[in-house]
Amino acid sequence: KADRDKPMNIEADALKHDDQKQLTIFNGKVHMTKGTMVLKAARMEVQQDNKGHQIAKLSAEPGERIFFRQKREGLDEYSEGEVETAVYNSQEDTLTLTTRAELRLLRGTVVADRIQGQQIVLNNTTEVFMVDGKANAATGASGSQRVRATLTPRAKTNETAPTATGTPLKPSQRIGNDKP
């Protein structure tokens, strides 16, 4: 959530900008950061509307995948993964991963959960993600598979304090034995 209003910083081997269309194309070893979000791809097209909202379309080299990583709000946890194509929408604060999508949830540095599908949509505002195993005809993705997930239970914590038993303590000004 905190990343939503952060600036988008991009490095690449080459850049082409069309001011008329408000379209910027980055090619070659693209590295984008936006707050704690990191995206690495071969190519990225950023379209900006007149309100400043950005849509970034990322693609990998043939046979390769894009890498992404983002810290989860208020936790020592990260979402990371790989995919062939991705679209980041700054207005909706969503990241859509399409074709051979894999999402890993890390607790600290340990992979806790792993989710795979043809399309994964992450909503950073609501912290909800949806996974689909079917190919998306709109993106030209081929093939279909079942969604696969490995989910690790969270460590148990004491959510409530133990209930007090016995006689409550009373304040005293004396220390020691009160017996005669």
Where are these regions (language model features)?
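Mature-chain termini and adjacent capping regions
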Residues: 1-180
